[in-house]
Swiss-Prot record:
This is Ribonucleoside-diphosphate reductase small chain. PANTHER family: RIBONUCLEOSIDE-DIPHOSPHATE REDUCTASE SMALL CHAIN, RIBONUCLEOSIDE-DIPHOSPHATE REDUCTASE SUBUNIT M2. The keyword Metal-binding applies. Interacts with RNR1/OPG080 subunit. Can interact with host RNR1 supunit. It comes from the Viruses. Belongs to the ribonucleoside diphosphate reductase small chain family. It comes from Vaccinia virus (strain Ankara). Induction: Expressed early in the viral replicative cycle. Its EC number is 1.17.4.1. InterPro entries: Ferritin-like_SF, RNR-like, RNR_small, RNR_small_AS, RNR_small_fam. Its cofactor is Fe cation.
Length: 319
């Protein structure tokens, strides 16, 4: 049995820290905590009213996917990962991740509630898993992995793919709107959320490195390429990014680029060997490393939480 999954009678007490790298990730998550009340969406309505019908359609569907997906991630954490993983440091991270995912879901729901005035359309968007086939396909894939009999390692990769690949193109599409100077509330919340998801993805890679018997490279590649094809279809066929003026082929390449970054972080060879086609995404968290945090997006980092130099807390650790 994997040491991180083995019964641990000390799991109820935090100190002494046994896994300093995992604890450091938890402290980074804690330092980046934010709430929806800190995001000003009051100026978005003016921009929203100026968008084309295609642009509105695209944004509404992306928000609908996001609003549902965080709940799926949380269900996996509650039902599987939090009960399987026995080391305290990881349980701290997963517990905090659940709180953050709730904030993401509330943020997306608030954005839908603000932009969409028709109550029937709101219900349609809030129930996207049932009402939108393109969202249902992604949700079904993620939910399948919650209940899968595969080992923790395989399911860890699947949810790294959900947070690293299934969100990547949608994040990029909203950053594209930021490049155009539109929707400051939406784009700022997107910065915060993509930063959080970048850390969650990095945490999955760190947990993977703690496995003594990880899944094979072939298994990992299979899960990741499956996620890539679903995400490419989502943003080039089901909900094409050309609706907001983005290039579909470049989006396909970008999703492959993100997948390569993920599989490299896991310690395997790249699959696609492509370069990032979106210059505006060069400094965004999904490119990988959590050094994105050190930029303090919008100065959102809790004061003092990461300032201790002792107890192995360091911002210089390179995973």
């Amino acid at each position: 049995m994997e040491p991180i999954l083995a019964p641990n009678p000390n799991r109820f007490v935090i100190f002494p820290i046994q896994y300093h790298d995992i604890w450091n990730m938890y402290k980074k998550a804690e330092a980046s905590f934010w709430t929806v009340e800190e995001v000003d969406i009051s100026k978005d309505i003016n921009d929203w009213n100026k968008l084309t019908p295609d642009e509105k359609y695209f944004i509404k569907h992306v928000l609908a996917f996001f609003a549902a997906s965080d709940g799926i991630v949380n269900e996996n954490l509650a039902e599987r990962f939090c009960t399987e993983v026995q080391i305290t440091e990881a349980r701290c991270f997963y517990g905090f991740q659940m709180a953050i995912e709730n904030i993401h879901s509330e943020m997306y729901s608030l954005l839908i509630d603000t932009y969409v005035k028709d109550s029937n359309e709101k219900n349609y968007l809030f129930n996207a898993i049932e009402t939108m086939p393109c969202v249902k396909k992604k949700a079904d894939w993620a939910q399948k992995w919650i209940h899968d009999s595969a080992g923790y390692g395989e399911r860890l990769i699947a949810f790294a793919a959900v947070e690293g690949i299934f969100f990547s193109g949608s994040f990029a599409s909203i950053f594209w709107l930021k490049k155009r100077g539109l929707m400051p509330g939406l784009t700022f919340s997107n910065e915060l959320i993509s930063r959080d998801e970048g850390l969650h993805c990095d945490f999955a890679c760190l947990m993977f490195k703690h496995l003594l018997h990880p899944p094979s490279e072939e298994t990992v590649r299979s899960i990741i390429t499956d996620a890539v094809s679903i995400e490419q279809e989502f943003l080039t066929a089901a909900l094409p990014v050309k609706l907001i003026g983005m290039n579909c082929e470049m989006m396909k390449t970008y999703i492959e680029f993100v997948a390569d970054r993920l599989i490299s972080e896991l310690g395997f060879k790249k699959i696609y060997n492509v370069t990032n086609p979106f210059d505006f995404m060069e400094n965004i968290s999904l490119e990988g490393k959590t050094n994105f945090f050190e930029k303090r997006v919008g100065e959102y980092q809790k004061m003092g939480v990461m300032s201790q130099e002792d107890n192995h807390f360091s911002l210089d650790v390179d995973f």
